[in-house]
Amino acid sequence: MKQSKKQGILERFYYSSDEIIEKPFNWAQMWRLLSYVKPYRKTILPLSFLTVLIGTAVKLVIPILIGVYVLDQAITARNSELLIQLILIISGLYILNYAANVLRIRWMNQLGQHVIYDLRQHLFTHVQRLSHRFFDQRSAGSILVRIMNDINSLQELFTSGVINLLTDLLLLAGVIIILFTLSPELTIAIMVTLPIMFFISTSLRKKIRRSWQTVRLKQSKLNSHLNESIQGIRVTQAFTQEEENMAYFDGVNQENYQSWREATRKNAMFRPLVEMTNAIGTAVLIWYGATLIMNETITIGVFVSFAFYLGMFWEPISRLGQVYNQLLMGMASSERIFEFLDEQPNVKEKPDAIHKKKINGEISFEEVEFSYDEKRKALHAVSFSIPAGSTLALVGHTGSGKTTIANLISRFYDATGGTIKIDGVPIQNLSLASLRSQISIVLQDTFIFSGSIMENILFGRPDASEEEVMKAAQAVGADEFISGLAEGYQTEVEERGSVLSAGQRQLISFARALLADPAIIILDEATASIDTETEVKIQRALKTLLKGRTAVMIAHRLSTIRDADRIIVLDHGKKMEEGKHEQLLAKGGIYAGLVKAQYSTG
């Protein structure tokens, strides 16, 4: 029974957007990733490549100097002068190689940091421009994973992975050329095991790739739950669901652990394969090389050089397992990053969109329909008009379509049918910036950012002066409680304003909206979470706030909309009634029933 309950907990969430992305490795994607290096192709990048070339050249020269020149010429001829010269040259080359490696690491780290900064900035900027539907389909945790974890996993790829791959490929090419130059038959003999290793490693490739994709998926799920648990800790504790929450965390943490374990297990199979092949190659070198020496086909110096080069040959191949691991992790992360970057806003701005510096605020809905998905229709042919400067109240049960109308006015979504106009202009013809900059929205659960109260109010208009901020706060009655704080307007508040009461947070949001000086104000259940005393203050402030502005009020407390110019009653996305407060009461319909029910329970 306990197991089945835990299994049910583990199935609590499912994020369809975080499924494993199954795409074969392709160079087009790799080139797209490397395109972020282009801004540095004339500075850090060529310097890094230069150090790679110098380091590789030094490594390739030293075995020849030791084997062919030191052993076969200096020592065999007992030429001490030549030996000293060669020792000095080899020592100098080692110093040069050290300097090249230091500079390579330094410049590649700089390049990697630049690329990661640019990529994260690009992704965050792109996500900021995506439509609300994108965020409806994804958890905050899964988005955070891609912006932070997935991009971080690319850091090692750029700082060492790509350059190591280039270095190893150059080294392998150089070693193979030199080996064939020294002795083609010995080279062929020691490489007989390569096809076997290539066949086995190719079969492992897809499995290793998929395992790292699974790791990314499980990390996303784990981070999503952590983010949700922290945000909802009060609800968890209020309902004493700590044990259930910990059980779920144990499940996703176990899944994450198992995915890492499986990925490292499969990846660990590669290095022993290389070492086994290296051992076979070394055995062939000793046996066949000794035969060639005894036949005087090659010298001892060439044999020693071969031994050096054989180590240099298998060393990068062995490292290729680690580099390939970095590459696979990078590709898995880049697929997820590019999936976000390829997302297009559902709400698109026309190239010739009109940028109106000032709108009057007249709003009209003409047979407007909207669906959040194919199964759920939120609005059914809704029509109404709001003259500029007037107040419209929307009333109805939860799910009746009130918030949907507010979202459509702000163009967070596009209507699936009908036309919405602002000042007689179809809303799609207006630029998003000019439209949204002249609309202020105050929500029931207002968001307070980490920072000072001054900064939170300034969010409505960042270029406003401190005096203007204080005037806005005074107008909505927020100045009274702000001035009573130890630091006043410079008081630091935590994320979501947890140190403030619901009423205080709402007053700050009103001040923020007033400071923005919008033509249209949308109040979405804005007075639902405040006490009666605070509501009286806000009702006074609203008269100042709404004066000369178009207002759309989504009402929970029907007492707050008595003075609205017009009230529309919605039910399951349909407009059922329309009129003033007194008219609708006299009609004795849905609105009258809602008022009666609220007063009888209040």
Report each predicted region and the residues it spans:
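Helix-loop-helix
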Residues: N79-E81, Q85-L88, I178-V192, E262, ...
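Transmembrane helix-loop-helix hairpins at lipid-water interfaces of multipass membrane proteins
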Residues: L45-A100, W107, F180-E185, A283, ...
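An intracellular "coupling" helix at the cytosolic face of ABC transporter transmembrane type-1 domains
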Residues: L34, P39-K42, H132-R133, N149-F158, ...
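Transmembrane helices of ABC transporter permease
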Residues: T43-I54, L93, I163-T214, I286-I298, ...
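Hydrophobic alpha-helical transmembrane segments of ABC transporter permease domains
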Residues: P46, V58-I62, L88, A100, ...
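Membrane-integrated ABC transporters
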Residues: M1-V58, A74-L86, R104-M108, G112, ...
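Juxtamembrane loop-to-helix connectors within ABC transporter transmembrane domains
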Residues: Q29, V37, R104, M108-G112, ...
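ABC-type nucleotide-binding domain
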Residues: E349, K356-G602
